[in-house]
Amino acid sequence: MPLAREAVELLVQAARAWYFEGNQHGLRDREWMALRFLHRANRFSRTPSALAGFIGATRATASQIVKTLESKSFLVRKPSHEDKRSVVLHVTAQGEKCLNQHDPINHVLNAVTALGTDECLRLRDSLREILNHLDAAHQRLDASICRDCMFLAERGPGIGQVAAKGRATAEFMCRLYRAPVSLEETELLCTSFERTRDRPKIEEHLDRARVASQG
C-alpha cells in the first residue's frame, strides 16, 4: 500500500502540468485540454457534446471554450459529412503551432520520451490497466485509441487495394457508426470507445495495413 500511495502521489504531481490556476500563453487549463483533445480526436468525437464529456464540463461551458479557441483562430467549425445537422470542430494550422510550441504538457511528453521505447510502453500499459480498473469500478468509459476498440473491423478487401496515386491502401470500418476508417484514423482518440478483447488480432491486421500503406 505505501508503494501504491507513492505512485499515486507522483501521478498527482505530474498532473499539475495540465491543471493550473490562471492561464499559460493565453489559455486556461480546460482550454488547453480542449485544444489538445480536438487535435487528437477522430471525426466522430470532434463535436461540442463529445468535447463536453471529455473535459467534464457542461455543454454551455464547452461551447464557451470553443468560442474562445475560435476567437484565437485555433479552431474552425465545419458541417459533418455524416450528419449535416451537426458540426465538426477542426484545429487550424495556427492551433497546431500553438500546441507544438506552448502546450504545458510538452515537457512531460519530453520526459516520458526520454525513458526510451520499452519503458514508455510499460508505463502506457500500466496506466491503461489502472484506467480499466477505474472504468469498471465506476461503470464509465474513457476516450481511447481507435485501434484498441471493439467496434473497429477490417473492411472488405481493404488490405492491398491500390489508391489513385498508385499506393496501397488499408481500410477499416467502425461498426458503431457504420463508417469507413482510414489507417491514420486508427491512431486517434474516440469518445465512443469500448476496449476489445481481441487486441492481438486487431494489431496483426494493423501491422499488415501499415506495411501495405507504405507500399
Residue ranges and their predicted role:
Residues R40, S80-H81, E154, A179:
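Short polar/acidic secondary-structure junctions
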Residues M1-H25:
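N-terminal leader segment of winged-helix/HTH proteins
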Residues N132-G215:
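Mid-protein regulatory/catalytic core that forms ligand/cofactor-binding pockets
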Residues Q101-S144, D148-M150:
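Terminal interaction helix/tail motif
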Residues E70-C120:
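Charged, amphipathic alpha-helical coiled-coil/dimerization segments
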Residues R43-V87:
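Canonical helix-turn-helix DNA-binding module
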Residues Y19-T58:
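N-terminal helix-turn-helix DNA-binding core of bacterial DNA-binding proteins
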Residues E6, Q13, M33-F37, K97, ...:
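Pre-recognition alpha-helix immediately N-terminal to the DNA-recognition helix
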